[in-house]
C-alpha cells in the first residue's frame, strides 16, 4: 500500500526522500510527494504517476530543507490526482498517511460545522485538520497529535512535521507498519527496513497503538495509554543492492530466475543434508500427535501455497486441513479447537487481514505458526512460532520466488508432521527429502523452457480469456497461474479443478479459448486427458504442461506441449510454477503493461 518516509537530517533531504521512496515502489502507488521545512515554512512538491514525475518537479523547483517527509500514494479515498497526493499540509503542519480512517465522515462533518474547508477527497485531510485545529487552539505539536490520535478509528501509519520546528517529527502506528531508523545526529521514519536501508542498519518497529516523538538525537516512544516504552533495536541488512534489477528488464524476471538459488537456501535451512532428514530451524512448542486439525489462512498467492500444503498435510500426516481466505476467516467466527494448529502465510508479514485472523486464532487458544519472508514483521512477532522463507526481498508486485519458498517451507513442515505422527517411516522421509533436494536443479531445468514460452505468449496475448486446469496439487497451481496472468497482463483468466470442467466452465470453450492444462504424469493423469479431449472436441486451444511420460501418453493434440523434467510427483507445484510464471510474465511484456507495478495493485496490503 502507501509508502512513508521521514528524515531529520543534516543536509538537504529532498533527494534522499525520493531515493527512499524508490525503494518503496514495490508496494504499489499512483502518485507521490515530499514536504520539507524551508526555513520556518512548509513547502511541498507532488506529482501524479511515477516518481520520475516528482523528480522533474523537484528539478524545476528544488527544496533545500533538512527536515522532510515523503509518500507514495495508493488511492483508497479519492482519485489518484495531484490534489489528493500526500503530503497534505496547512501553514502549521504536514502529514503523510498509510491506511484508512474509518470514522472520517463523522469527523469531517464535525470539522466542517466548525468552519474547516476541505480541499481534497481523502480521509487523510481529516487527520491534518484535527491536528491543525488543535494547534490553532494553543496546543503544542506533541499534545495536538496525542489528542488527535485519540479521535481516530481505523488502520493508519502517520508521519508529521511542523512549521517553525526543524528538530521535530512525530510518527504513529495503528495497524500498518512503521519503523524508526537511528542515525548519527539524524533520525528516520519509514514504512519498512528497505526504505531506511541506505541510511541506517539499526531500526525499531512501533507496535500497534504506539506513537513516537523524534528529534535528531532521540526517539521517545509512547504506547496507546501514553506511557513511555522501549522497543527493541534490530540490526538489519537492507542494502541498496537489494532493489537492483541487475541485467533483467523487470524485477519479476529477475525474481523468477532467482528461484533455484533462493529455494535452495530455504531447503538448506530446513533439511539436514548429512542425515537426509527434515530439521526445522526452530523447536515447535507443540506435538503434532496432539493436533487434530490444521487451519491455514492467507491471502492471494500465499493462499494457493496453503492450498497445495493442504494436500501434503493430509497425505503425509493424515491431518484434516482447512484453507481459508483471511478476509473471510477473520469475520466468520470459525470454531477452533484449543490446542489445534493455525498456520498463517504472508510474504510481507504485514497483510492486514492475515494479521487480524492470527489475532483471532490466538484468542481462541490454538497454536500459531507464521510462514513469512520478513522475520521482523508484525505477523512474525505476534506468532507463537516463525518459519522464515529465505526468498530475499521480492520487489515485483506479483509474487514468484516468495510463493515457491513458501511451498518449500510447508513441504518440510508437512513431512515433519507425518514423521511425528507415525504416518511416515524413516524410509518414507528419506525418499521425500530426496525429492525436495532435487527441486533447485529441476527449477533450473524448467527455466530452459523460456524461449518456447515466450513464443507461446504471443498467442496468449491475442486472447480475451484463458482457462487453467489442474488436478490434485496442480489445481491450486492452476488458480495461481490464472491469478498471475490477470494480475500483470490484464487478460481475464480463471483456474478450475479439471474435474469441474463439465460443471460450468466448458460452456466457455470455443476456438478462441486457450486452455492451460497443468498435468504431470501421475495417478490422475488419464482423468485429466479425458478433460483435454472435452476441450479439443469444442475447438479449444490446449497448452499442456507435463513431463516426458505425459507428453508421450497424452492422446489429445495440443497447440503447445511444454515438457517438464521428471520428478517426484508430490512436489511438482514448486517446479511447474516456473513455466506458469514465465507465461504470465512474457504475455504481460507483449501486452505492454507495467509488469512490476500492475495497475490498482499493491505489494503489501496493510489495510482491509
UniProtKB/Swiss-Prot annotation:
InterPro entries: GATase_2_dom (IPR017932), GFAT (IPR005855), GFAT_N (IPR047084), GlmS/AgaS_SIS (IPR035466), GlmS/FrlB_SIS (IPR035490), Ntn_hydrolases_N (IPR029055), SIS_dom (IPR001347), SIS_dom_sf (IPR046348)
Gene Ontology terms: cellular component: cytosol
Subcellular location: Cytoplasm
Active-site residues (renumbered): 2 (nucleophile), 603 (for fru-6p isomerization activity)
Enzyme type, top EC level: transferase
Keywords: Aminotransferase, Cytoplasm, Glutamine amidotransferase, Repeat, Transferase
GO terms under biological process: carbohydrate metabolic process; fructose 6-phosphate metabolic process; protein N-linked glycosylation; UDP-N-acetylglucosamine metabolic process
Repeat is among the record's keywords: yes
Listed Pfam families: GATase_6, SIS
Reactions catalysed according to its record: D-fructose 6-phosphate + L-glutamine = D-glucosamine 6-phosphate + L-glutamate
EC number: 2.6.1.16
Subunit description: Homodimer.
Role played: Catalyzes the first step in hexosamine metabolism, converting fructose-6P into glucosamine-6P using glutamine as a nitrogen source.
Classification via NCBIfam families: glmS, PRK00331.1
Protein name: Glutamine--fructose-6-phosphate aminotransferase [isomerizing]
Gene name for this UniProt entry: glmS
Amino acid at each position: 500500500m502507501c509508502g512513508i518516509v521521514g528524515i531529520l537530517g543534516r543536509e538537504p533531504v529532498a533527494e534522499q526522500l525520493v531515493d527512499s521512496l524508490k525503494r518503496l515502489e514495490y508496494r504499489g502507488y499512483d502518485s507521490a510527494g515530499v514536504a520539507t521545512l524551508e526555513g520556518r515554512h512548509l513547502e511541498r512538491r507532488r506529482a501524479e504517476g511515477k516518481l520520475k514525475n516528482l523528480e522533474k518537479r523537484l528539478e524545476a523547483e528544488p527544496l533545500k530543507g533538512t527536515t522532510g517527509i515523503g509518500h507514495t500514494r495508493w488511492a483508497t479515498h479519492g482519485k489518484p490526482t495531484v490534489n489528493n497526493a500526500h503530503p497534505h499540509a496547512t501553514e502549521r503542519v504536514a502529514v503523510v498517511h498509510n491506511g484508512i480512517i474509518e470514522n472520517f465522515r463523522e469527523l469531517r462533518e464535525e470539522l466542517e460545522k466548525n468552519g474547516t474547508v476541505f480541499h481534497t477527497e481523502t480521509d487523510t485531510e481529516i487527520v491534518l485538520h484535527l491536528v491543525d485545529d488543535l494547534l490553532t487552539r494553543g496546543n503544542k505539536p506533541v499534545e495536538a497529535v496525542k489528542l488527535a490520535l485519540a479521535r481516530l478509528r481505523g488502520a493508519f501509519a502517520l508521519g508529521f512535521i511542523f512549521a517553525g520546528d526543524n528538530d521535530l517529527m512525530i510518527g504513529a502506528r495503528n495497524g500498518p507498519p512503521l519503523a524508526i531508523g537511528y542515525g548519527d545526529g539524524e533520525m528516520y521514519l519509514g514504512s519498512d527496513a528497505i526504505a531506511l536501508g541506505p541510511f541506517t542498519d539499526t531500526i525499531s518497529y512501533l507496535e500497534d497503538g504506539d506513537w513516537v516523538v523524534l528529534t535528531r538525537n532521540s526517539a521517545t516512544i509512547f504506547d496507546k495509554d501514553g506511557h513511555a516504552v522501549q522497543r527493541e533495536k534490530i540490526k538489519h541488512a537492507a542494502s541498496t543492492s537489494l532493489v537492483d534489477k541487475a541485467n533483467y528488464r523487470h524485477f519479476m524476471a529477475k525474481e523468477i530466475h532467482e528461484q533455484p538459488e533462493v529455494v535452495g537456501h530455504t531447503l538448506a535451512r530446513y533439511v539436514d543434508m548429512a542425515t537426509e532428514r527434515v530439521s526445522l530451524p526452530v523447536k515447535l512448542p507443540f506435538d503434532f500427535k496432539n493436533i487434530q486439525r490444521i487451519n491455514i489462512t492467507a491471502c492471494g498467492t500465499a493462499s494457493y501455497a496453503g492450498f497445495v500444503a493442504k494436500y501434503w498435510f493430509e497425505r503425509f500426516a493424515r491431518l484434516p486441513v482447512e484453507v481459508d481466505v483471511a478476509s473471510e476467516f477473520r469475520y466468520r467466527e470459525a470454531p477452533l479447537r484449543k490446542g489445534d494448529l493455525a498456520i498463517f502465510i504472508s510474504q510481507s508479514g504485514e497483510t492486514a487481514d492475515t494479521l487480524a485472523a492470527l489475532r483471532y486464532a490466538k484468542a481462541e487458544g490454538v497454536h500459531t505458526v507464521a510462514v513469512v519472508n520478513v522475520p521482523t514483521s508484525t505477523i512474525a512477532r505476534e506468532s507463537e512460532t516463525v518459519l522464515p522463507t529465505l526468498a530475499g526481498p521480492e520487489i515485483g508486485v506479483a509474487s514468484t520466488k516468495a510463493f515457491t519458498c513458501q511451498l518449500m517451507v510447508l513441504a518440510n513442515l508437512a513431512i515433519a508432521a507425518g514423521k511425528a505422527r507415525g504416518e511416515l517411516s524413516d524410509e518414507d522421509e528419506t525418499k521425500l527429502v530426496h525429492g525436495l533436494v532435487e527441486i533447485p536443479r529441476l527449477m533450473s531445468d524448467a527455466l530452459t523452457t523460456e524461449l518456447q514460452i515466450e513464443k507461446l505468449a504471443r498467442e496468449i496475448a491475442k486472447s480475451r480469456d484463458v482457462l487453467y486446469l489442474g488436478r490434485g496439487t496442480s489445481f491450486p497451481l492452476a488458480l495461481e497461474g490464472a491469478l498471475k496472468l490477470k494480475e500483470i497482463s490484464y487478460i481475464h483468466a480463471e483456474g478450475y479443478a479439471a474435474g469441474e470442467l463439465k460443471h460450468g466452465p466448458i460452456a466457455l470453450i470455443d476456438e478462441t479459448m486457450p486452455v492451460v492444462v497443468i498435468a504431470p504424469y501421475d495417478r490422475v493423469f488419464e482423468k485429466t486427458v479425458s478433460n483435454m479431449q472435452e476441450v479439443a472436441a469444442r475447438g479449444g486451444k490446449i497448452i499442456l504442461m507435463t513431463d516426458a511420460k505425459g507428453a508421450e501418453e497424452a492422446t489429445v493434440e495440443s497447440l503447445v506441449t511444454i515438457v517438464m523434467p521428471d520428478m517426484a510427483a508430490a512436489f511438482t507445484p514448486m517446479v511447474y510454477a516456473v513455466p506458469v510464471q514465465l507465461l504470465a510474465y512474457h504475455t504481460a511484456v507483449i501486452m505492454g503493461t507495467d509488469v512490476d507495478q500492475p495497475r490498482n495493485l499493491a505489494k503489501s496490503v496493510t489495510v482491509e
